[in-house]
Amino acid sequence: MEGKVFLGHNLIWVMLLMGQLHGYKSCIDEEKIALFELRKHMISRTESESVLPTWTNDTTSDCCRWKGVACNRVSGRVTEISFGGLSLKDNSLLNLSLLHPFEDVRSLNLSSSRCSGLFDDVEGYKSLRKLRKLEILDLASNKFNNSIFHFLSAATSLTTLFLRSNNMDGSFPAKELRDLTNLELLDLSRNRFNGSIPIQELSSLRKLKALDLSGNEFSGSMELQGKFCTDLLFSIQSGICELNNMQELDLSQNKLVGHLPSCLTSLTGLRVLDLSSNKLTGTVPSSLGSLQSLEYLSLFDNDFEGSFSFGSLANLSNLMVLKLCSKSSSLQVLSESSWKPKFQLSVIALRSCNMEKVPHFLLHQKDLRHVDLSDNNISGKLPSWLLANNTKLKVLLLQNNLFTSFQIPKSAHNLLFLDVSANDFNHLFPENIGWIFPHLRYLNTSKNNFQENLPSSLGNMNGIQYMDLSRNSFHGNLPRSFVNGCYSMAILKLSHNKLSGEIFPESTNFTNILGLFMDNNLFTGKIGQGLRSLINLELLDMSNNNLTGVIPSWIGELPSLTALLISDNFLKGDIPMSLFNKSSLQLLDLSANSLSGVIPPQHDSRNGVVLLLQDNKLSGTIPDTLLANVEILDLRNNRFSGKIPEFINIQNISILLLRGNNFTGQIPHQLCGLSNIQLLDLSNNRLNGTIPSCLSNTSFGFGKECTSYDYDFGISFPSDVFNGFSLHQDFSSNKNGGIYFKSLLTLDPLSMDYKAATQTKIEFATKHRYDAYMGGNLKLLFGMDLSENELSGEIPVEFGGLLELRALNLSHNNLSGVIPKSISSMEKMESFDLSFNRLQGRIPSQLTELTSLSVFKVSHNNLSGVIPQGRQFNTFDAESYFGNRLLCGQPTNRSCNNNSYEEADNGVEADESIIDMVSFYLSFAAAYVTILIGILASLSFDSPWSRFWFYKVDAFIKKVRNLLL
């Protein structure tokens, strides 16, 4: 009997299965044809097969089984279409009429499809009303502008609308959305909307549960303005606080100001509140503790002040994510020692909160995944109990505190991300760190006082990708287990330590490394052969060590090398030709060595290059093709000779430094074509002739954005080792379904880009000293130095057009004539040196208009007249005017009452001054000859005085003869 029952049950299941199979219908032909038509208009023919390989046009092909298509199993009609992320035609306009055959479509995904607009020649703006069942529309990451809202207003059935990362700007067009009364989720993040947020208009969307306006430029106050304040769009009480169904609200990364409105507490169903990266002020209201449904609270990166107590969050039993950070230094986070919270956090970030100890309530947290307590004043031992209590902890950020003891757990942990940089650790680095944290992907212990050798246990971190041990006092050789065991390493920073030995004399397992920083150590010997195996290496910095020998030719054969820095060593010999024929190389710094030989005649790079070869023993001439691809060329203090070449293709060069060589001849007129020049230094050579007036045509920043120059080189790589886990996925047991944004509930710090960079440092003389400039300071420096040459003639009047120039040095030449009044137009000038020349006439009083001038030198010229006073000229001392006997007034001690100091105004032409000087020289010569003739005539007479004179001469001659014999 039991067997029959069992058989009956099986027959029933078989019959049900057959019924289901019989009820399944393939897609209908009309929609199949429409899908092919849609593909033809959106995907190029050459890409369609590779993008959608399952889309075949044979009779047996069921379009319901195609990639990106889903159908109703009973009717066979298409319900979902997804072209998201496919390679669509660039700037394509979508013809909405192509969608009309899909009457039952509920979800349409065209995200990341490069669409730029919609159109329908028949239905116009009302086209989307044809799709009566459309509920989900994803148009994120395209190129749509505000005109799309005219079409969207007809899609009244929509419940979910994604428009993030498009080209929308200006005022937010809320009126076009007010008819979408079924909307539950609206994502307009990462656009360029500005002005006030029109919450009053959005209040008609009564069903709205999730609103994301993050990453825009919205401004205005979030303070309660009052229900009857009709002239303010951002009326919180009559707007956002009436959205009673709101569960997620993200207004982060905008420019909102003011205090948090107290009426937010009326949104009792709120589960996600993100107001981070705004300019909110005031105290953090304790009333947030009444939002008992809250799971995600981020007030990160604002300007909150006053004190904040965790006790105010006592009733938030569902809280899992808490982020608080203030750019203001007056926020004080209090920690109650006896308080035990009801919640179990997964993420806590309390950055820049002026905390002096780890919050006590964290002792009761057992499910933490991410802890950020950086930028505080916490001292004492590293809280290893956080790791012991939270076995799922993946990220621990404790940088920029005052920890003194690096205490780690006694047993192994699964931590992935550890940053303890910039603390006060004053003892040895943990020997067993590699055994305790074998799964680390990111480790930063830089800017501490760690000493002794690097522990060999580091080699156990075979998954480590980023390691920064720089700016400590580590010494000794690199452990062999370390260079062989960390085979996943991508970026390694060992800079500014006391490490010694040879650099990779043998092969290593760092085959995946992209950036290797070993500068400012005590490494010795030759450049090791082990570097040859680093085939993915992009950036190599070995500067400021004690390396000897020659630069091996194979180093230029590393296939991915982009930046090579070996400055400040003891290298000698020629520069390998391979470095000048490497197309990928963008930064080559071989300065401050003993390299000799010549620069190869060709540079094969296709990109802008920074070439730093100063302070060597290089000789010969400069190839005239060298500047074709170079942006920065520094050849200072070498032994180059000959003429400065008539460079070709010089439009890319922005910094040209040739100081301290043996260049002769005139300044080539080709340099007048330096359309992007920022710094020009030709000083301390033997250049002669006049200064080309056409140098005034060079840019020196005029008409350029200050950000147009970027001399910092870096590398970055995306890491997917963390993947960022979604709270909705990891904690779904206490959710009722969910409409959560993954962008809100994904732990974004876990999926990060690793970055490493080196800043180009340039030395330039301003204000009578050499300073090194880099980063933002370098971008703002515009200067020309032609000093210490043999230049003659006058200062070009046209130089007054160099309006952006900050520093001009023409000292130690043979310049004559007057100081041009046009110099007064150079309003940004800070340093102006004309000393040790032959300039004449008065100092133009118009120069007092140079309000930025801090250094002015005209000493040792032939200037005359009254020294101008006022503004910056009141700050210059007498040293600025030494060697000009005809100058008077302050700050010299010479009175101007004597007529001998009077001189014709600078309105007198320069050639008139020259005539005066010629007359002076002729008069001086005539007087000298007259005196000499008078002496000789007196000696011709026979007198006691003449006999005495001849006696003395004979005695002197006899004495000299005796000394020689």
Curated annotation (Swiss-Prot):
SUPFAM superfamilies (UniProt xref): L domain-like, RNI-like
Annotated LRR repeat ranges: 80-102, 103-127, 131-154, 156-179, 180-204, 206-230, 243-267, 268-290, 292-315, 316-341, 342-365, 366-389, 391-415, 417-435, 437-461, 462-485, 487-512, 514-533, 534-557, 558-582, 584-606, 608-627, 628-652, 654-674, 675-698, 778-801, 802-825, 827-850, 851-875
Sugar-bearing residue positions: 57, 95, 109, 145, 194, 315, 377, 389, 444, 509, 546, 581, 652, 662, 688, 697, 809, 814, 862, 893, 898
Pfam families, per database record: LRR_1 (PF00560), LRR_8 (PF13855), LRRNT_2 (PF08263)
Topology versus the membrane: Single-pass type I membrane protein
Membrane-crossing residue ranges in chain numbering: 917-937
Family statement: Belongs to the RLP family.
Protein name: Receptor-like protein 15
Species: Arabidopsis thaliana (Mouse-ear cress)
Gene: RLP15
